[in-house]
Amino acid sequence: MQHETLLHIQGIDKSFPGVKALSNACLSVYAGRAMALMGENGAGKSTLMKVLTGIYSKDAGTIEYLGKQVTFKGPKESQEAGISIIHQELNLVGNLTIAENIFLGREFVTPWGSIDWKKMHQEADKLLKRLGVSHSSHQLCSELSIGEQQMVEIAKALSFESKVIIMDEPTDALTDTETAALFKVIRELKAEKRGIVYISHRIKEIFEICDDVTVLRDGEFIGEKAVNVLDEDQLIEMMVGRRLDEQYPHLDKPRGELLLEVENLSGSGVHDVSFTLHRGEILGVSGLMGAGRTELMKVLYGALPRSSGKVRLAQQEIHNTCPQDGLNHGIVYISEDRKGDGLILGMSVKENMSLTALAYFSKSIQIDHKAEQLAVGDFITMFNIKTPSQEQQIGLLSGGNQQKVAIAKGLMTRPNVLILDEPTRGVDVGAKKEIYQLINEFKKEGLSIILVSSEMPEVLGMSDRILVMHEGRISAEFQRGEATQEKLLAAAIGKSAL
């Protein structure tokens, strides 16, 4: 069956100083169908979307939209033509209401020239209802969770009534309920003959909601296939050029002596938690969203206040009242929100990586920049970070490379305990494998690791021992050999282990 082509991108080339980002990149979007755009981090997906919407100019190639060749001069022009993009990074104004954010710059006006607040809120409420969001459009965006803010971004894109809607990692911060609501809307959009470009690293979502898939690798077009003729292994092989038969390369190594003891720890969202951690051990922490996993790590690290309990490191009791205390005691926390808490996107790779370790490069009151540069260079090589130079602005790197820099930044302080909170969120399958291999290297060197993850296969595949949290408490503990997804899920919802 032939489908109407809304958008056809052909033979796009784009180079930056020292880097060829796109080479003969292609993409077609069809009416009433969702096209997945897949590829590892750094494959060129975001660059191609920026060329399409006019943020970057192309070096070669053509863009046809609704049968006409076009070159957009910027996002405003492409949006007015009927191409909307939902960015992975939130772009909301916190002290404005939901309605004000949705219609910012496009406010409804009365015949008398004033803003028609009533109509604006009515239209915003309709969009929120369509997405299953229960909040009033009068609520400030600063009062919303990250997932709820993402739904506002989606509502904003829907308000344009676009022919083509590009969704860049739209479910990254969404709950299962919010994701189901989004998928319902995508199906409605397809029924209205809109075209969807769906960019995601969550392969299961591709098979659930998309009709076709286009794969880029190293900036080049690899192929376009109907989703129903592929399986997961074939799609992964297209993306990375090899099969990933062993996604979780667990290192079987005896753990060392007891390093960390947490006894009856309570604090913000955490109640009476006790556990231990040994040298060279990977301790997985599983649980549903809101179970208190991140809060526990932040209380342990000193980013959230502790109300009671004891923490002993190498048999010495410690009191982390702020993150600097955690760092001083050799505990490093790599946040789940690398862009909000972990990295400064406007600074360079070098500046980000060495920021918390400048004391190691200090000579009296001066920084030994040569030593800093050498150390950063070593980590770039060790972590296989793809960057033109140490001076590259980190916000221009792919998500996987940003995550590697965030982890390297923590390791520069030479910690005893490394807490990784959702270390592979928003990271493609190839970069995930590299991060898992790095984790095994850290383990081999005797580093103690706490791995917090929402992905049960990741926790099961990488951990030596697993804690499950429910409502701020430890609901179960499993040794590697006895844990299953069914047992983890049962403990996560508060049931007895199966």
From Swiss-Prot:
The ABC transporter domain, residue ranges: 7-243, 254-496
Amino-acid positions noted as binding ATP in the UniProt annotation, renumbered to this chain: 39-46
Membrane topology: Peripheral membrane protein
Record keywords, A-Z: ATP-binding, Cell inner membrane, Cell membrane, Membrane, Nucleotide-binding, Repeat, Sugar transport, Translocase, Transport
Subcellular location per the Swiss-Prot or TrEMBL entry: Cell inner membrane
Identification of the protein by name: Ribose import ATP-binding protein RbsA 1
Pfam families assigned to the protein according to its UniProt record, in alphabetical order: ABC_tran
Annotated function: Part of the ABC transporter complex RbsABC involved in ribose import. Responsible for energy coupling to the transport system.
GO terms for cellular component: plasma membrane
Species this chain originates from: Pasteurella multocida (strain Pm70)
Superkingdom of the source species: Bacteria
Family statement: Belongs to the ABC transporter superfamily. Ribose importer (TC 3.A.1.2.1) family.
Enzyme class: translocase
Classification via PROSITE patterns: ABC_TRANSPORTER_1 (PS00211), ABC_TRANSPORTER_2 (PS50893), RBSA (PS51254)
InterPro entries in the record: AAA+_ATPase (IPR003593), ABC_carbohydrate_import_ATPase (IPR050107), ABC_transporter-like_ATP-bd (IPR003439), ABC_transporter-like_CS (IPR017871), P-loop_NTPase (IPR027417)
